Amino acid sequence: MTISSTEQEAKKVNVVVDRNPVSTSFEKWGQPGHFSRTLAKGPKTTTWIWNLHADAHDFDSHTSSLEDISRKIFSAHFGQLSIIFLWISGMHFHGARFSNYSAWLSNPTTVKPSAQVVWPIVGQEILNGDVGGGFQGVQVTSGFFQIWRAEGITSEVELYWCAVAGLLMSGLMIFAGWFHYHKAAPKLEWFQNAESMLNHHLSGLLGLGCLSWAGHQIHVGLPINKLLDAGVAPQEIPLPHEFLMNRDLMAQLYPSFNKGLIPFFSLNWSEYSDFLTFKGGLNPVTGGLWLSDTAHHHLALAVLFIVAGHMYRTNWGIGHSMKEILEAHKGPFTGEGHKGLYEILITSWHSQLAINLAMMGSLSIIVAHHMYAMPAYPFIATDYPTQLSIFTHHMWIGGFCICGAAAHAGIFMVRDYNPAQNYNNLLDRVIRHRDAIISHLNWICIFLGFHSFGLYIHNDTMRALGRTQDMFSDTAIQLKPVFAQWVQNIHTIAPGNTTPNALATASYAFGGDVISVGNKVAMMPISLGTADFMVHHIHAFTIHVTVLILLKGVLFSRNSRLIPDKANLGFRFPCDGPGRGGTCQSSAWDSVFLGLFWMYNCISVVIFHFSWKMQSDVWGTVQNDGTVTHITGGNFAQSSITINGWLRDFLWAEASQVIQSYGSALSAYGLIFLGAHFIWAFSLMFLFSGRGYWQELIESIVWAHNKLHFAPAIQPRALSITQGRAVGLAHYLLGGIGTTWAFFLARIISVG
């Protein structure tokens, strides 16, 4: 049923709830598998425990009521928030109880951040290294110290208060999750009111969120950081509430505070330019962005988002209607355009989740790149272990979110997509063009793979033959990234025209000066050459292959020439039944499974490239005469142009710290390096095995048990094909990420 414009204006926001819809029953929750009739009967075979884990959070399988599913998801979100608050509370508690935060705050260039002390059990206190400031502990690389400094936290007592607040919020969230499922559960129409949700999320979460951060920075963060930058001891700085209550105190640091709100209401906003700045570049004392620039930035964002949160039509009959916008969105070659998408988005939470995961994943990757190019917090740029850790962290998070987007897009296509409601709209047209899309993607993957890898093979061969003049390199056959160099140059000279009042470029990665703090490079121009051109094409290759696998899984998730009735088989199925050989591993789930391996390949190349490039061309020490000595002495340009160079000069050379870490404070990384290799190798046992082999093995073991009259009541079963692949994938990724983590940190803590 379509709703006309006049009817839509009458779609009022009505907060409607059902009172006491579900009783609170610990007895019910105590029964494993209570959400499924089959599982509730208890285990007959060992498959039961696997199905219990697989289906516990698959709310679609518990009920067909969209309202009940929506309530469960809503309630689960509060549980997630509770865990996040508990984690944040724990981080602040560690900072308050087990850290050298005060020592670091007084001397952030030589004291290393530590907020973890290992108990002395059988010699484990060796892990507590001397991090400076008379403190023995484990060096941490989360960036929390730098965030606390930017917030204006000057003592451990304040961290205790933050920890207590986190605990209280955690408890409140658990209560809210229970309350909104068991006591006052929203009706389906509340969940489906897209306009109201957009208004509240844009204005409330993003708008007021930015405004509160800007307000905190202006009233607390800026004055405290200004005093810290000037060398005032933390214990002598007034407490945050004194800056809030005492305008004279603020006016000593920022004179415009004397004028109060008069410049605001008289539109004379430039009066506030002493604390809302547009300087550009980095603060030379801290090596981080100017906090007055970031306060200005968040204030501007707050205005934009609060305005954006008034754009959608709810009770007042003015503003946009999402349905109208989507249905009007069509061009001469796009058929019905976005008709039908509104109905999809308010009835399929998998479709919403897929879009949100793709967006958040991409955003996380963008954040990873901004955090080194424009370091946001004081002294984070010269803390190389933290810089490497947060880059790697945001890259992995982005990769996982994007793969999750493909997973939920596949689930949407199988469970929620209705072909009858999507005739000739853009989604239908993409599905009908899928052969062209996938075959083109396949062609570009082959092209990129052969050409990018081929450049390396050529270079390896030429170097082995001693024909260095025939190699692709900056000193022989040049393949300069001319477009990237042009972009860098534009960004270096643009601020002079676009922002004439800015003091410096947006990021020194594009060009400009070397910014050093405590004789360490915080940021400097990143020169690009043949080596970067080559590895960027490897990035293009691995990204396109990942997209090919994931997109193929989504577009062919309902049917294919091989299996026309895929939609009936579900999101994950091992094969198309007996007697149809060659149909295994073709479900949408299997595409996500394969896509995750390529995501791992892809992100690994990115973080290896970043780690080596920064050590070679950016990070290092600055002598008094201004000369820069890089950690690996600029070897990236000549070594990374061969496969052998990556193996010998990056992986092998930089693994020496983790391999030789035994007997030092870094020895845990040596053990993790070893253990994670084992976890990775263990995964291969699941990935390369046949199910029948294990089933036969189990049956002979059961025979032996029967012979001795202690056969188990629950019948043992081999893992299904899908379960085995899931276990293999989990250990492959866990082992790979653990290995990389230990390799990176042992290296960079030693040399950084």
Swiss-Prot record:
GO terms for molecular function: 4 iron, 4 sulfur cluster binding; chlorophyll binding; electron transfer activity; magnesium ion binding; oxidoreductase activity. GO terms for cellular component: chloroplast thylakoid membrane; photosystem I. P700 is a chlorophyll a/chlorophyll a' dimer, A0 is one or more chlorophyll a, A1 is one or both phylloquinones and FX is a shared 4Fe-4S iron-sulfur center. Pfam families: PsaA_PsaB. Chlorophyll a' binds at H677. The chain crosses the membrane at residues 73-96, 159-182, 198-222, 294-312, 349-372, 388-414, 436-458, 533-551, 591-612, 666-688, 726-746. The keyword Methyltransferase does not apply. One of its GO terms (biological process) is photosynthesis. It is an enzyme of class 1 (oxidoreductase). Its EC number is 1.97.1.12. Chlorophyll a binds at M685, Y693. It comes from the Eukaryota. [4Fe-4S] cluster binds at C575, C584. Phylloquinone binds at W694. Disulfide bonds: none annotated. Its main location: plastid. Keywords: 4Fe-4S, Chlorophyll, Chloroplast, Chromophore, Electron transport, Iron, Iron-sulfur, Magnesium, Membrane, Metal-binding, Oxidoreductase, Photosynthesis, Photosystem I, Plastid, Thylakoid, Transmembrane, Transmembrane helix, Transport. InterPro entries: PSI_PsaA, PSI_PsaA/B, PSI_PsaA/B_CS, PSI_PsaA/B_sf. The PsaA/B heterodimer binds the P700 chlorophyll special pair and subsequent electron acceptors. PSI consists of a core antenna complex that captures photons, and an electron transfer chain that converts photonic excitation into a charge separation. The eukaryotic PSI reaction center is composed of at least 11 subunits. Belongs to the PsaA/PsaB family. PsaA and PsaB bind P700, the primary electron donor of photosystem I (PSI), as well as the electron acceptors A0, A1 and FX. PSI is a plastocyanin/cytochrome c6-ferredoxin oxidoreductase, converting photonic excitation into a charge separation, which transfers an electron from the donor P700 chlorophyll pair to the spectroscopically characterized acceptors A0, A1, FX, FA and FB in turn. Oxidized P700 is reduced on the lumenal side of the thylakoid membrane by plastocyanin or cytochrome c6. This is Photosystem I P700 chlorophyll a apoprotein A1. It comes from Guillardia theta.
